[in-house]
Amino acid sequence: MSSTKIGVHIPIMVDEVIDALQAKKGGMFLDCTFGSGGHTKAILDASPDAWVIAMDRDARAIQRGSILANHYGERLELVHAPFADLEQAVSFKGFDGILADLGMSTDQLKEGRGFSFADEGAFDMRMDEGSGVSAQEFVNTAPERDLYVALAEGGVGQNARIIAKIIVEKRPFESARQLADVIKNAHVGKKSESRVHPATVVFQALRMKINDEIGQLEHFLQAVPNASKKGTRFAVITFHSIEDKIVTNRMRSWESAGSYP
């Protein structure tokens, strides 16, 4: 079936996702991280018998999704909720396929919300802008110990303590770019020929802290079996070893217990 020409960002691994979910056979699917809508659209285009319930904690993502919802009609239902609230937010049980893409959406990186190093304005970093503390408030007010813990748990590693100290010394910060530049100019750790920005993992750790990404992921994985049935296909796209370890361990526990999916 040919793809409908609606302007959405083409997500990574879209062909692999369609194959893993066997979306061409049709069925009821749950996209737990709607984002820019690329995976949802691909599932719906894979078969006229495919239906999707798509969740996202980001209100802007749900608003953007109205174009797809208008086009696909009753085949697409949008739900504004974090995937950790799966059991409360989605009443349907027995999905044929469940998808979670744990990466940032292109739209989020372009919206000037502090997810990008280049953002000049106030940096927020909250997926749900109506709850919790912004990254700017956390970075500018948190005790050094709390900053260190967030960085260490977020994957910064042995440099977490010194980076936390530098942040406290150089704050307040008014933009994501200012913070990224301070980290870059600090020359922490060994010199590297890598093209990866020195602040990449720091920003990852702050985003994980602000959005409680590990807690959200663990609650979501606990809810997946109750939304599944025998034969449900489950696909998760992870972007760092912390996520990967949590997902892998949970899937092994399902296998050992003989539970779904």
Report residues per predicted region:
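S-adenosyl-L-methionine-dependent methyltransferase catalytic core, i.e., the SAM/SAH-binding region
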Residues: 1-261
